[in-house]
Amino acid sequence: METHATTILAVRKDGIVALAGDGQVTMGQTMIMKHAAQKVRRLHDGKILAGFAGATADAFTLFELFESKLKEVRGHMVRAAVEMTKDWRKDKYLRKLEAMLLLADREHILVLSGTGDVIEPDDNVAAIGSGGPYALAAARALSRHSGLDAETIARESMRIAAEICVYTNDHVTLETL
């Protein structure tokens, strides 16, 4: 799936998880529509962080579905993600949604792909969106070769992604657990 207009990054280090997202919304390939969109939010009484990349309406549909699954499984993020992706794969309308979610709680970081996969990274760093590869590379390097904390790694990695990706800006929303 091709995603534009965003970078979402999660970093866990020393027991802290940070989830960051830029604020740019791009219409097509030629126009920036918004600079300060909120693509990162807290779910389940603030215990889970979530960010999205892709079509906004589709992402909100996925947020709603995920939140309903969270309630069903009493806040267990991994189980809710797996249950949601089962529905995602089975439902012919959900399969057409063009969005991805990046989820984090104190123990796990998960990517829910546009094809209904649940992926947990090996190295406590994950990113989605058009600037995701740049933010991911920066975050991995900073995690491995610096004494920076999760929040600083996330902010600096997002700054680097914004310098490279034309669909990402430096208006960053960052949440931590």
From Swiss-Prot:
It catalyses: ATP-dependent cleavage of peptide bonds with broad specificity. It is an enzyme of class 3 (hydrolase). It holds the Pfam family Proteasome. The active site is at 6. GO terms for cellular component: HslUV protease complex; proteasome core complex. Keywords: Allosteric enzyme, Cytoplasm, Hydrolase, Metal-binding, Protease, Sodium, Threonine protease. It is found in: Cytoplasm. GO terms for molecular function: metal ion binding; threonine-type endopeptidase activity. A double ring-shaped homohexamer of HslV is capped on each side by a ring-shaped HslU homohexamer. The assembly of the HslU/HslV complex is dependent on binding of ATP. This is ATP-dependent protease subunit HslV. It comes from Desulfovibrio desulfuricans (strain ATCC 27774 / DSM 6949 / MB).
